Curated annotation (Swiss-Prot):
<keyword id="KW-0949">S-adenosyl-L-methionine</keyword>
<feature type="binding site">
    <location>
        <position position="112"/>
    </location>
    <ligand>
        <name>S-adenosyl-L-methionine</name>
    </ligand>
</feature>
<dbReference type="GO" id="GO:0052908">
    <property type="term" value="F:16S rRNA (adenine(1518)-N(6)/adenine(1519)-N(6))-dimethyltransferase activity"/>
</dbReference>
<dbReference type="GO" id="GO:0003723">
    <property type="term" value="F:RNA binding"/>
</dbReference>
<dbReference type="InterPro" id="IPR001737">
    <property type="entry name" value="KsgA/Erm"/>
</dbReference>
<dbReference type="InterPro" id="IPR020596">
    <property type="entry name" value="rRNA_Ade_Mease_Trfase_CS"/>
</dbReference>
<keyword id="KW-0698">rRNA processing</keyword>
<dbReference type="GO" id="GO:0005829">
    <property type="term" value="C:cytosol"/>
</dbReference>
<dbReference type="InterPro" id="IPR023165">
    <property type="entry name" value="rRNA_Ade_diMease-like_C"/>
</dbReference>
<keyword id="KW-0963">Cytoplasm</keyword>
<dbReference type="InterPro" id="IPR011530">
    <property type="entry name" value="rRNA_adenine_dimethylase"/>
</dbReference>
<feature type="binding site">
    <location>
        <position position="18"/>
    </location>
    <ligand>
        <name>S-adenosyl-L-methionine</name>
    </ligand>
</feature>
<dbReference type="Pfam" id="PF00398">
    <property type="entry name" value="RrnaAD"/>
</dbReference>
<keyword id="KW-0694">RNA-binding</keyword>
<dbReference type="InterPro" id="IPR020598">
    <property type="entry name" value="rRNA_Ade_methylase_Trfase_N"/>
</dbReference>
<feature type="binding site">
    <location>
        <position position="91"/>
    </location>
    <ligand>
        <name>S-adenosyl-L-methionine</name>
    </ligand>
</feature>
<comment type="function">
    <text>Specifically dimethylates two adjacent adenosines (A1518 and A1519) in the loop of a conserved hairpin near the 3'-end of 16S rRNA in the 30S particle. May play a critical role in biogenesis of 30S subunits.</text>
</comment>
Length: 268
């Protein structure tokens, strides 16, 4: 049988499907997620249920968002899970997660994310950060390194700044390719994202911060002065105490927020 077939389902490349099969890893992830009935538990991309089954067993109801119609049908007919699940068939990148919030309950979101959409999905989820208590995701190890990077690190970029603006980022464990069927060509890792109740560096307009980061990191090897010359003058960099000769990966989240807030003040 092809290595792409697992539990009778053929992994679909266009959906980025690699199914988690290592029980030890599954148990550790479920322990990190800490399922409970005090939150709305939400799984993105339940796949064949490696995380779905142990999480659903521990709680009264689990909401899942799954794009693959074949997998949705399997879940709807699952002898154990069908009565525990609220299933939304659709694209998580387009999904309005705020509709899942109920009074007095924030979301706990988790999933073994398709690696081909993980970065845009992170940006989408940050828009709902105020409604989310915790997020636990299996990602390409390289993406976890980007999420958790420090200034000056080559992995530090736009995703880093936006993730650390919204959340505390905690790498949880590394997962080798043989823990999946079929094995991916890259190493994986689990990350915990804890949205801030109060942001350490509040931004006056997060859209300005997002655009500033996009512009700054568009040409990583060039200086801030070069990349942001249409946005901030040398005098304004000096006022902020930021050296415009530095490269974008050398600037902290706090400094990016300070620059964005200055842009907001100029636009007011």
């Amino acid at each position: 049988m092809s290595s792409k077939v697992h539990l009778g389902h053929t992994a679909r490349k266009r959906f980025g499907q690699n199914f988690l099969t290592d029980d030890n890893v599954i148990n550790r992830i479920v322990g990190a997620i800490a399922p409970d009935n005090d939150h709305v538990m939400v799984e993105i991309g339940p796949g064949l249920g490696a995380l779905t089954e142990p999480v659903a067993t521990a709680i009264d109801n689990l909401t899942v968002v799954e794009l693959d119609r074949d997998l949705v049908e399997r879940l709807q007919n699952h002898p154990v899970l069908k009565d525990k699940l609220t299933i939304h068939q659709g694209d998580a990148l387009q999904f309005d997660f705020s509709q899942l919030v109920v009074p007095g309950k924030k979301l706990k979101v988790f999933g073994n994310l398709p690696y081909n959409i993980s970065t845009p999905l992170m940006f989408h989820l940050f828009e709902f950060a105020e409604q989310i208590e915790t997020m636990h995701f299996m990602l390409q190890k390289e993406v976890v390194l980007r999420l958790s990077a420090s200034p000056g690190n080559k992995a530090y970029g736009r995703l880093t700044v936006m993730a650390q603006y919204f959340c505390q980022v905690v790498p949880v464990l590394e997962v080798p390719p043989h823990s999946f069927a079929p094995p991916p060509k890259v190493d994986s890792a689990v990350v915990r994202l804890l949205p801030y109740a109060e942001k350490p560096f509040p931004c006056k307009d997060v859209n300005v911060l997002r655009q500033l980061c996009t512009t700054a990191f568009n040409m990583r090897r060039k200086t801030l002065r070069n990349n942001l010359k249409q946005v901030l003058s040398d005098a304004e960099f000096e006022q902020l105490g930021i050296d415009p000769n530095l490269r974008p990966e050398q600037i902290s989240v706090e400094q990016y927020v300070a620059m964005a807030n200055m842009v907001c003040d100029k636009q007011a």
